[in-house]
Design a protein with these regions (language model features):
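A broad detector of short, well-ordered amphipathic alpha-helices
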Residues: 61, 229, 250-254
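Conserved thiamine diphosphate
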Residues: 127, 226-249
Length: 270
């Protein structure tokens, strides 16, 4: 029934479209500045996948309206700096200082590279006076490692703070196409999603598919047709959308959220 509304096309208000454009512009401007100012420095750009920023932003806005109080997010290095700046509110001054090689005291800084850093913020996404907690777990260059950590953090928050009410905590995982298809840990997390001892009420997985894994063409990286075929293991809903169509990306993310919040069958949504 939901898919039949408006022929499954985005039905966004003018204000929503303007906000999406604002977040997209922030993502593009951020990457453009880094490319101009810090030529040749590693930053693992989100260029080509900037629609991730308005997608996550729209997800948080909508989930806040549905009563979610905490977001626990994990992602690899691709696009992390833009996410820190444009979603989590990390100061761009601090990010640029890391590019400039600013020294930090050992007591307050773990010495890891800038695109591995985590962050925790309290934000008021809908400007209604209600603040929510959003956390991005730190992640090394070991792809998909953070996925299990995010599930553990979410499960602990559910049990300790919300009497296991899965509508209050939302885990979000962002993957690359090569990593979700090639790393065994991703499969293990999916298989544990509905087990009583590990369930978190369902995780929303977002795959940024740039069709390459380091230097490996996707045709040489997996046997399955799609990198997201791992979701079929548990019959989880899987949606494919063109990242160049930002409104369609937002539409897909909001559908994933609605499914997760309505059915609470502890499945993932990809």
């Amino acid at each position: 029934q939901r898919l039949n509304i408006n022929d499954n096309h985005p039905d966004l208000s003018v204000d929503q479209k303007k906000h999406i454009l604002k977040k997209l512009n922030q993502a593009v401007s951020f990457e453009s500045f880094l490319h101009t100012k810090y030529v040749g420095q590693k930053r693992f750009s989100l260029e080509g996948g900037e629609s991730l920023i308005p997608a996550i932003d729209s997800l948080i806005l909508a989930a806040d309206d549905l009563g979610v109080e905490e977001f626990v997010m994990g992602m690899a290095h691709r696009g992390r700096l833009s996410t820190l700046a444009n979603i989590f509110g990390k100061s761009t001054k601090d990010i640029f200082s890391e590019f400039d090689g600013k020294d930090y005291d050992d007591e307050v800084f773990d010495g890891d590279v800038k695109y591995h850093m985590g962050w925790t913020s309290k934000i008021d996404p809908n400007k209604d006076g209600k603040k929510i907690n959003i956390s991005l777990a730190p992640n090394p260059s070991h792809l998909e490692t953070v996925g299990a950590v995010v599930q553990g953090i979410a499960r602990a928050k559910l049990e300790n703070n919300y009497s296991s009410d899965t509508s209050k905590v939302l885990p979000i995982l962002v993957h690359g196409d090569a990593a979700i298809a090639g790393q065994g840990l991703a499969y293990e997390i999916v298989q544990m999603a509905k087990l009583k001892g590990y369930a978190t009420g369902g995780t929303i997985h977002i795959v940024v598919n740039n069709q390459i894994g380091f230097t490996t063409n996707y045709l040489d990286a997996r046997t399955s047709t799609y990198c997201t075929d791992i979701g079929k293991v548990t019959l989880s809903p899987v949606m494919h959308v063109n990242a160049d169509d930002v409104e369609a990306v937002v539409h897909a993310v909001l559908f994933a959220l609605s499914y997760r919040m309505k059915f609470k069958d502890r499945k993932s949504v990809v």
